[in-house]
Amino acid sequence: MRSLLLGTLCLLAVALAAEVKKPVEAAAPGTAEKLSSKATTLAERSTGLAFSLYQAMAKDQAVENILLSPLVVASSLGLVSLGGKATTASQAKAVLSAEKLRDEEVHTGLGELVRSLSNSTARNVTWKLGSRLYGPSSVSFADDFVRSSKQHYNCEHSKINFRDKRSALQSINEWASQTTDGKLPEVTKDVERTDGALLVNAMFFKPHWDEKFHHKMVDNRGFMVTRSYTVGVTMMHRTGLYNYYDDEKEKLQLVEMPLAHKLSSLIILMPHHVEPLERLEKLLTKEQLKTWMGKMQKKAVAISLPKGVVEVTHDLQKHLAGLGLTEAIDKNKADLSRMSGKKDLYLASVFHATAFEWDTEGNPFDQDIYGREELRSPKLFYADHPFIFLVRDNQSGSLLFIGRLVRPKGDKMRDEL
């Protein structure tokens, strides 16, 4: 079947090349903002945090799909350190491995980093991002904290009354929907602890490819969640030249797909065959990723990816606690007195909610490429089973996103033998 798919993709590629009548030049690459030394340092720290947090979440049996923005998580830690005192503040910096940086360096550096890497215009991606800190109706946020958190982290603030829980949840979800232009209609159906502060990050991210998928190269296929469970999904296909590596020893493939303006790339790691991702996740470290990427070579690759929107909400509270953020979430120990002027507040939840859209859009493809000899026998990267993916900034090496797709939206198709 895969041989047939490969032949079909090659024929479609040639046919589509002939269909394009007028050559269209790709958009000029964007210009990356030069980061300061403190922002560069925090980019490195946030990447380390990305792998630590991902590994912690991957071990949670209750978690299927994972979708994290390490930049946004780092900003959440910065916000806690801004509003905290003593050990509560120092723990937040320690989780970010920023203990040796002055507070002002952390806040200005993180602010600069997020503004630069989430600049949708410069990067030609769609990234809608909002952060809001909800406090109990009995608590008032201090003016200095409101001003500083808005300046550095673009964080909004609001009181919320959970006496009417249904109305409170509706308010949170409506804000998230408005922030993402309706792409993320719901953050959560429930809040367990309602006597503390809720930090909510709501995001919508849509990569625009350096070379788009053609809209005709889309069809319905099966995605094997496990060997015995398959769901129906829409798949998109294209053949092009990509950085690619096949680790035959570890039985996995990597492909790097540049995004429009080539300031960032999407990297996908996938086992050769359907299997739980636990084996790959044990291999995945910052250093191992660097090693794999160093072995990549430009090759012709026929890529098939699921098409659609993946919506994921994580309450990061317990996972951050596992990395060392224990005081801020403890009602009896938290000192967030810079937030409210009193030691009367703790962090009850850290909601990290994202809608990530896999779509065909991007720069016009170069139709001349399909006449080249090197595209005659492409490698096949058929993502019809669970995989890990990362969106990486090519200048700083910082990760905009890290995640895994285990169960896309779709109805059960059949049981496999």
Curated annotation (Swiss-Prot):
N6-acetyllysine sites (modified residues): K206, K318
Motif Prevents secretion from ER: chain residues: 414-417
The keyword Signal appears for this protein: yes
CDD domains hit by this protein: serpinH1_CBP1
Gene Ontology molecular function: collagen binding; serine-type endopeptidase inhibitor activity; unfolded protein binding
Localisation per UniProt entry: Endoplasmic reticulum lumen
Superkingdom of source: Eukaryota
InterPro entries from the UniProt entry: Serpin_CS (IPR023795), Serpin_dom (IPR023796), Serpin_fam (IPR000215), Serpin_H1_serpin_dom (IPR033830), Serpin_sf (IPR036186), Serpin_sf_1 (IPR042178), Serpin_sf_2 (IPR042185)
Single GO biological process annotation from the record: collagen fibril organization
PTM annotation (Phosphoserine): residues: S140
Record GO cellular component, one term: endoplasmic reticulum-Golgi intermediate compartment
Residues the record lists as N6-succinyllysine modifications: K93, K295
Alphabetical keyword list: Acetylation, Chaperone, Endoplasmic reticulum, Glycoprotein, Phosphoprotein, Signal, Stress response
Pfam families: Serpin
Name assigned to this protein: Serpin H1
Species per Swiss-Prot/TrEMBL record: Rattus norvegicus (Rat)
Lineage, opening ranks: Eukaryota, Metazoa, Chordata, Craniata, Vertebrata
